[in-house]
Amino acid sequence: FRSSFKLKEKDKKYIEEAIEALMECQLLVDSKTTETDIKKNISIELTNNCNLHCVHCCVEAGEKRKKDLSTEEIIDIFNKCISWNPKMITLSGGEPLLRKDFKELLVYLRSNYNGHIGVSTNGTLITNSNADLLVKYADQIDISIDGVDEETCSIVRGKGVFENVIRNIKVLQDKGFNNVSLSMVFSDKNEYLEPAFLELNRQLGTTPITRVFAEIGRGKDSKNIFSDKGIDDVYIPETFLDLNSKQQLGVRTCSAGRNQLFVRYNGEVYPCPSYMKREYCLGNILKVQKIDELLVDSEGKKDIQELMLKTDMLYGKKCANCELSLFCWTCPGE
């Protein structure tokens, strides 16, 4: 634990003494985490093409018509991902429903994988026909809406998207599918919409997902739409500070590259969508026999987060010498 962070010796000693005191009071207990306890998740970007052009898209998806991998190549990726034994596989994009072979791919994945299948979509292309497919083969559908009405949604996602999404959610629900989540990106400029977003989800019977704006992808060019804060200011959504929340407190660490991976539309593997710079690419899944080969450095070491620390990936150059970085609770990729 101590060696994993850039701390002064006096700070390491202080933390050790604090931990020992908490354990003596039984406010902190030692819990061994085994390999079987780790819940792996992997997201696969089936395509980078999208029918929308959202201003904050982290993968810069749009109607660029980037070449998709073939059906056979995606199935090869599926097989390697399944062998990694993740708890959940999410099919994302771009817009995954744009792929003409989406039905074939989803059916194949369900037939060969017993874990949790999620589909991340903008919700605009859901029809009666593919809704039947989603209801039958997917366990969870995550829809990005980024607004609470036509006016607020159109700023980020374009005109007409809001009503289309609401209508298609009801199509899914009318078919008996209720595991639908709605996500919205927040920062200081639109935080006043948080209560309305939660109320919208209550009315729709969907699960609200609150995301924090990140300056990655097209977000680098649209910060003025979301935030006036400087680099040293951190925005924290109200839902993260809810004192009435029943969520159990615990220690949380970045899972990127350890039990979370992101496969891009071209087969490149990254620790997560927030780390998609060239220097963070772990390799191409199509060029290896199994995923574990991508999680080994030149010395055969399998601790990706150690590599991340060595390259300042977790705490970046701007935070490398900060004495409080250990206690920072924001996503290091943001």
What kind of feature is each model-predicted range?
Residues 263-264:
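Short, acidic, Ser/Thr-enriched surface-loop or helix-capping motifs
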Residues 254-258:
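Short, small/polar residue-rich loop motifs at catalytic or cofactor-binding pockets
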Residues 1-47:
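Long, charge-rich, low-complexity alpha-helical segments
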Residues 177, 215-249, 274-321:
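C-terminal accessory region of radical SAM enzymes
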Residues 71-92, 99-212:
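Radical SAM/AdoMet-radical enzyme domain recognition
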Residues 63-65, 149-156, 219-221:
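A short acidic, helix-capping loop that chelates divalent metal ions and anchors anionic groups
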Residues 49-59, 271-274, 316-334:
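Local cysteine-cluster metal-coordination motifs and their immediate loop/turn environment
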Residues 36-37, 41-72, 84:
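Canonical Radical SAM [4Fe-4S] cluster-binding loop centered on the CxxxCxxC motif
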